[in-house]
Structure formats: C-alpha cells, structure tokens
Amino acid sequence: YGMQNISRDKRVQAIIIGYMFAAFIEGAAGFGTPAALAAPLLLALGFPAMAAAIICLVFNSFPVSFGAVGTPIVMGLSPLKPILDAGVADGGMTYAAFCKIVGEYCTMMHIPMAFILPVFMLGFMTRFYGPNRTWSEGFSAWKYCIFAGVCFSVPYFIVAWTLGPELGALHHRVAG
C-alpha cells in the first residue's frame, strides 16, 4: 500500500505530493516545511533530486500567501492594525475585515495559477527530467492538471471568501 498503488505515473505523483500535499502542509505548518517533507517523498518515489526540489519549491509559490493558518496575512498586516482600528471610529473597516478582504483578493489572483502552474510544471518536469525529454509528455496530462486545479481552487475560493484567511490556509487543501 502506498503511492505506487495510487498511480505509477510520475506526473500524477508530482501533482498529488508536490502540489496538493505540500499545499496542505504549508497551511498547517508553513515556513519551508512543505519542501522539507514533500521532496524526500518524491525522492523515495524515484524522482531525481533536483526535480523533486524544483517541483516542491515552485508548487509552493502561491500557497504561501495564506501560509501557516493565515500567518502571512494576519501577522504580516499587523502594523496596520492601529491605523485601521482608528478608522473604525470614523466608520471605516476593522482590522479583521481588512485581512479578510486581502485574503479575498489574494484568492482571486491565485485562481488562474492553480490551473496554469500544474500544466507548466509537468511540462518542465518531463522536458528536463523525463525519459523522452519532451514538453508534450507533460502537457498531455492537462486534463488531470485541470481537475487538480478545480479541486484546489474551488474550495480555496469558497473558504477564503466565507471563513477568512486563517481557515483558508487549510480547509481547501484537504479537498485537493
């Protein structure tokens, strides 16, 4: 029982471990943990070391916006808290509302990448590390990439827009 029984296709393994699993770990722990956990798993499945590192680091490029339970948004914007709290007296928005809006805009910017990045990365992986060294071998898995993008982005959008950046870091990645 293991990843080999789910799929022997390296492209599928890269998506499941490098994209979905690493994004979940980013939401739970953040701070570089996804690459530290996912890359050795890809190595154990027979990926070249450089390919495993590149896959994990590039796929982890946009889940970091929500980071470990929303830390980059909630803590990163904390210097604005006094300004926003002062604005509440004038009828402005609260710090929590501001963080939620930032999370919503973040989600909107990431949704296209949830579909583009997997296709590009599989093409890159097969071009430079595949047995046939062709882009088309990776691009031929575009249907699986679209499915993975939907599994990632639909819950991502719903959770970020309804629950906020803290929960947006985790819940949608479980669906992936």
Regions found by a protein language model. Give the residues of each.
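Hydrophobic transmembrane alpha-helices that form the pore/transport pathway of multi-pass ion
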Residues: 5-139
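Long, contiguous bundles of hydrophobic transmembrane helices that form the permeation core
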Residues: 115-176
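Hydrophobic transmembrane alpha-helices of multi-pass solute/ion transporters
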Residues: 1-3
